[in-house]
Amino acid sequence: MGNVEDVKVGIAASIDGADRAVAGIQAAADQLDQSLALLRVTAVGSFHPAAVAAINQLEQARLRLDEAIQLSRTAVESANMFRSMI
């Protein structure tokens, strides 16, 4: 472990990386929203099990991306708190 300033610089770099990851996850979530909307419109009136499964799976993927975003943001808050305390 380096001096306090080195630690703070490392934490800041980690936070920057996490922020970039959140932006990427958000972009992926937006794309999934578009894909899901298109699939719903395309499959309207169809009760085919494969269409229903595809919609359900995309919804689950979207929820997990939301969870990843929330966890990442919470981690950034914790890292910022740590950085401010040292």
What function would you assign to each model-found segment?
Residues 1-86:
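Amphipathic alpha-helical hairpins/coiled-coils and adjacent low-complexity
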